[in-house]
Amino acid sequence: MAASGKLSTCRLPPLPTIREIIKLLRLQAAKQLSQNFLLDLRLTDKIVRKAGNLTNAYVYEVGPGPGGITRSILNADVAELLVVEKDTRFIPGLQMLSDAAPGKLRIVHGDVLTFKVEKAFSESLKRPWEDDPPNVHIIGNLPFSVSTPLIIKWLENISCRDGPFVYGRTQMTLTFQKEVAERLAANTGSKQRSRLSVMAQYLCNVRHIFTIPGQAFVPKPEVDVGVVHFTPLIQPKIEQPFKLVEKVVQNVFQFRRKYCHRGLRMLFPEAQRLESTGRLLELADIDPTLRPRQLSISHFKSLCDVYRKMCDEDPQLFAYNFREELKRRKSKNEEKEEDDAENYRL
């Protein structure tokens, strides 16, 4: 768990405020990119404090925008800050910060979904997975449009120990829509419990540390924003391939209001569906009438372990997708209807 560190006394020289930079460069948040600017440095400082002690740390900031959190990170006396920004309009403002902190800020124009951060920092920063987290941190005020796909991507990286996690158990402090933040940290049985809850918590210690009211952002989003801290676990709570866990969890939660057996049935082809689902539940010792939100990580571990054995017995099972089966069936029905219509005309 990250310590709540104090910001360093190392300060940037006097600079225009973020609001002044936005006016100077005539910046406007792009709605299509789900951009919302956080201008209150008290709040950006708080985000950085909650990331832990960043003195002499190497930080990767995603989506810096006009540079509000960027300033707070630089004021924490980091060794180096790498920012990756997709929108070229923000580069001049970030360059202004780089000039004010020589040798501290590295700016990359790129997409966080494809950027290879595993090559960004020195090999000397790498630590064994079993050690304390490395002196590498990820911090970001994520655009809502990319927050969920990005955290899923990083969770898979944690599972494989690649991407940003080649350095070890790299900690992350990120913003999400409040509803998503609550789902990520939701306990078993809560109404917010979801696919994201299980996928994040089987791999990480997840904490929803505080909420920022939407009115603190420009433009004001329709929702509040939650700040979430992730520390990868030394040992994942489910020791199966990420894609297998993801498939089981997705199938269970696609019918979140039904009993869990309803979603689990979709793991199997129709011809063997009832028999295989019954076997899965019996071997995993799961009550079929539990709702998805009532299933603990231990329940999912049992389900994934048994499903893995069933996939080993039938190598084609893992590739099965019930939606593809529905498409094929629909296509056959349409062909039959066309044949029937043609025969009727004849």
UniProtKB/Swiss-Prot annotation:
| Gene that encodes it | TFB1M
Residues noted as binding S-adenosyl-L-methionine in the record, renumbered to the chain: 38, 63, 85-86, 111-112, 141
Quaternary state and interactors: Interacts with mitochondrial RNA polymerase POLRMT. Interacts with TFAM. Bound to the maturing mtSSU until the late stages of assembly.
Stored PANTHER family: DIMETHYLADENOSINE TRANSFERASE, DIMETHYLADENOSINE TRANSFERASE 1, MITOCHONDRIAL
- Compartments (UniProt record): Mitochondrion
Report what the protein is called. Dimethyladenosine transferase 1, mitochondrial
Q: Which InterPro entries does the record associate with it?
A: KsgA/Erm (IPR001737), rRNA_Ade_diMease-like_C (IPR023165), rRNA_Ade_Mease_Trfase_CS (IPR020596), rRNA_Ade_methylase_Trfase_N (IPR020598), rRNA_adenine_dimethylase (IPR011530), SAM-dependent_MTases_sf (IPR029063)
Q: Name one Pfam family in it.
A: RrnaAD
The observed outcome of changing residue 111 to A is: Inhibits rRNA (adenine-N6,N6-)-dimethyltransferase activity
Q: Name one GO cellular component term.
A: mitochondrial nucleoid
Report the domain of life of the source organism: Eukaryota
Q: What is the effect of changing residue 65 to A?
A: Abolishes methyltransferase activity, DNA-binding and SAM-binding. Does not abolish transcription activator function
Lineage runs: Eukaryota, Metazoa, Chordata, Craniata, Vertebrata
Primary place of residence?
mitochondrion
Protein keywords: DNA-binding, Methyltransferase, Mitochondrion, RNA-binding, rRNA processing, S-adenosyl-L-methionine, Transcription, Transcription regulation, Transferase, Transit peptide
Q: What is the effect of changing residue 141 to A?
A: Does not affect SAM-binding, DNA-binding nor transcription activator function
The effect of residue 183 to E is: Abolishes the interaction between 12S helix 45 and TFB1M
Q: Which Gene3D superfamilies match?
A: Ribosomal RNA adenine dimethylase-like, domain 2 (1.10.8.100), Vaccinia Virus protein VP39 (3.40.50.150)
Q: Which SMART domains match?
A: rADc
Q: In which tissues is it expressed?
A: Ubiquitously expressed.
Tell me the enzyme class. Answer: transferase
Which residues are the transit peptide here?
1-27
